[in-house]
Amino acid sequence: MPGDEERGFLAAREELASALRWDSAQVFPLEQLMPLLATSLPPAARYLQLDAGRLVRCNAHGEPRNYLNTLSTALNILEKYGRNLLSPQRPRYWRSVKFNNPVFRSTVDAVQGGRDVLRLYGYTEERPDGLSFPEGQEEPDEYQVAVVTLEVLLLRTELSLLLQNTHPRQNALDQLLRESVEDGMLQLSEFHPLLREIVPGPRPSAQGSTPGPCFLCGSAPGTLHCPACNQVSCPACDILFHGHPSRAHHLRQALPGSHQTASLSSSLPASSQPRPPSSSLALGDSSLSSPDPANACLPWHCLTCATLNEPWAVFCAVCSQPKGCKVPGIEGSHGTGGLEPEPARDQWACQSCTFENEAAAVLCAICERPRLAQPPSLVVDSHDAGVCQQSLKQEDPLLTAAQPQVWYCDHCTFCNSGPVWVCAMCNRTRDPIPTQPALQSYPSSLEKGRPKPGSSQHLGSSLPASCGDPEKQRQDKMRKEGLQLVSMIQEGETAGASPEEVFSALQYSGTEVPLQWLRSELSYVLEMVAELAGQQDPELGAFSCQEARKAWLDRHGNLDEAVEECVRARRRKVHELQSLGFGPKEGSLQALFQHGGDVARALTELQRQRLEPFHQRLWDRDPEPTPCWDGLDRQSLVRRLLAVYTLPSWGRAELALALLQETPRNYELLDVVEAVRHSQDRAFLRRLLAQECAVCGWALPRNRMQALISCECTICPECFRQHFTIALKEKHITDMVCPACGRPDLTDDAQLLSYFSTLDIQLRESLDPDAYALFHKKLTEAVLMRDPKFLWCAQCSFGFIYEREQLEATCPQCHQTFCVRCKRQWEEQHRGRSCEDFQNWKRTNDPEYQAQGLAMYLQENGIDCPKCKFSYALARGGCMHFHCTQCRHQFCSGCYNAFYAKNKCPDPNCKVKKSLHGHHPRDCLFYLRDWTAARLQKLLQDNNVMFNTEPPAGTRAVPGGGCRVMEQKEVHSGFRDEACGKETPPGYAGLCQAHYKEYLVSLINAHSLDPATLYEVEELETATIRYLHLAPQPADGEDLPAYQARLLQKLREEVPLGQSIARRRK
């Protein structure tokens, strides 16, 4: 039965796993993880899925801090893989993990057992380029992923505490390293894949046995063993092979019996790599084909030129042909010059290392050079050839035991050090001619075994001729690679990437698509650089991605050098800030992290923090008291004004002080300063500082007053706010004019736009938000009413835009249908008929219409506003001056001509311009209402127009008698619609006298009859003076009828009754 401690551990573990499943981005504080880390349970009981002890032991090579850092970094990446699988929005390619991912290669794949952690996540299907989920599995097992992710998180936290020496159990590392095999085997069934990978491979030969040859060159003895690659190599080939970024973190160990005495890290110093001793050389042609490893370290004869070469040489020292290669046409001492058999069709031989690769391989499996790569150039520098010839002649015995430690590459002129044969810059093999001093030890054998190859002069002259084509190929290849690099840089600049970023991406990853790599992988690399830099020197704090990016670009993508550069740069910046008085305790590390390593911005932030108390005291203090302007030290007051308020000159400061010292002191300091900046005229300044409000008479400085663009009136802020607030809430939009002079005239469309555009800015700063919103609403309605497509509903007085051409319109508010022209309620009988025909049909066939009599006729011929087209079902009796409630337009209800206010009439000859008036045509009800009914009837009879003198048939009488025309009457409770009720004389068709005259005048206007035909001479003279502004006089000898006929003709010709009347344009 499990104990209490184990049960508590399992319960806490399940709780954290459930929280991780619920929120994959959950960050567990150290206090929450500490109970799981401080338990006394062994690792096998704490890590049920992950074999943590074996994972640590199999990667424990070298210093504990180094391999714990490497393992912690790999676990951090593995934890991110698990969190991505638990996230609701997983990455696009979550189903597979690619081995060529640079972050994966340099972190997870650099430790033993990393891939099997991925298999625990569910990546169980092997692919040639990586791992993936099985095809039939649609979703990952969330419980399994959560448990494994939690154990990875716990192990990473435990390693971090060990690195910081803060682990609650001091023997935690010993527990992980010394766990017995029996405890590890308890979990063999659960974690069998991990055991298979992390069990170390077989070591090379035991102590005392002869090491095998290098797996790369096959000549030099292997002295180093790489457990990750399970290969043995010589020091020179080890530097070349493990210089690749994917193998840079492999740990190598010296083989027993070799000259290496300690395990080697990923970077081996050149001075510590021994050369094979010259005493091991032995002559004999049989050694070339001996399969015995002991004989593999013997010198070999070139099959082309028969030159004896050292055992570790890959190319011939004279003809530069690979080992075992025959060239037709050149016969050696051991061959006939025949062609060497070609490789099989399913294989190809590498031109650099002669390894035979599979036909489908693009890169060599040994040296990773491309299939079409040319062999190293055979051009020999003249200086090196001369040194070689001189060495051959002198036969210095010291050269047999000494190897030059510094040599220059013939291709890139890079200075290499140590006994390496491959250039560290361009990966070209060094020229073997000057590195063959061992040949001087066997002159007799060389002379007896083969013919002499010729003198040194012959060698120097024959090489350029035989190597011309390879040199041209090398130059062509360099040109092609350069053009490819330029093309990639241009493509990167087009996409926004700098040339340094493209080049660094190529150097780091070797990818052919650097832009795609920069978008997908650069962020992970920068995070790794920042994390490694922080682990290298924790005292420097956290590193930002901007610092990591700069260091990575400066070091052209070299990860290790970028980490070193990042640390060096941070140390330099911290020292610079510390010299300025801001050390780590003052927050310099945090400031550098926040501002991406920018010293200037970090210094600004630190200075701001240091000045924050001063600013706080400055603003928290009470307002500074106003100085006494009557002080004895006048010069001090002037200097204070000049300095604090930045006045333009000393004279302006004295003028401001003089105004402040005047009595009575009605001026404010800021008002005086503002006024003095604009002028130095004292009289003008006094007027500027004491502007009188045109409404209330309050005196204020000019800069506090409000003014409209339509007039020169100055209004104080309080009057301005109250006037426009009342106008908005209780009046029309056209009443928002100057409260003092009443300008501008908002009936003019040209003034309307410019006035309201400026007034909008002033009202925004003066009115309350509710009043300002009401202003915008009313202004919008006023603009819509000016649209020619705007239409008022005849039933509910709702306005809307009607863009159709049909006469039948439906109101969107009350959904009633009416005629667009005559405003009558739409009936099916109106379809296909004009409005006049429909009205005649209703008079004849509609009983309700007939029952109303002539009152319905007057109601249908109500008042329509000529500006906004709003209809009023009112009779025209009473005052003819009508004020529209919708648009505030003033007009005559009889002729629809406008009424003009004082001094607003556009007629220059108008004699009543200084009063409210209107200009009416002679057939307007304004004049004809003074005629008697009999005279109006005579005008209709003279023109054969029928009219009613009795109520139409079927008309119902009003209870109590009286006129039936509906009127709006004012009562105590408001307005009420009711019948006129006045007395109806006989012969007036059931109407009162006023409404009967209105009925007759409407017939006269409908038939365009001219009442001037019934004018007397006095009426003709009055009409001539009114419309023609002339005082007519009878001609000499002209009788009265002729004079009357002449005035009538003149009036009808010069003042006709046509379409100029607004009523007829309705």
UniProtKB/Swiss-Prot annotation:
Residues 262-287 have a biased composition (Low complexity). It is found in: Cytoplasm. The record marks 384-385 as: Cleavage. Residues 557-610 are annotated as: Interaction with RBCK1. Residues 558-609 form the UBA domain. Residues 469-478 have a biased composition (Basic and acidic residues). GO terms for cellular component: CD40 receptor complex; cytoplasmic side of plasma membrane; cytosol; LUBAC complex. A zinc finger (RING-type) spans 693-743, 865-895. A zinc finger (IBR-type) spans 773-835. The keyword Metal-binding applies. It catalyses: [E2 ubiquitin-conjugating enzyme]-S-ubiquitinyl-L-cysteine + [acceptor protein]-L-lysine = [E2 ubiquitin-conjugating enzyme]-L-cysteine + [acceptor protein]-N(6)-ubiquitinyl-L-lysine. The active site is at 879. Residues 251-287, 434-478 are annotated as: Disordered. Zn(2+) 3 binds at residues 793, 796, 811, 814. Residues 689-923 are annotated as: TRIAD supradomain. Belongs to the RBR family. Component of the LUBAC complex (linear ubiquitin chain assembly complex) which consists of SHARPIN, RBCK1 and RNF31. LUBAC has a MW of approximately 600 kDa suggesting a heteromultimeric assembly of its subunits. Associates with the TNF-R1 signaling complex (TNF-RSC) in a stimulation-dependent manner. Interacts (via the PUB domain) with OTULIN (via the PIM motif); the interaction is direct. Interacts (via the PUB domain) with VCP (via the PIM motif). Interacts (via the PUB domain) with SPATA2 (via the PIM motif); interaction is direct and bridges RNF31 and CYLD. The PUB domain mediates interaction with the PIM motifs of VCP and RNF31, with a strong preference for RNF31. This is E3 ubiquitin-protein ligase RNF31.
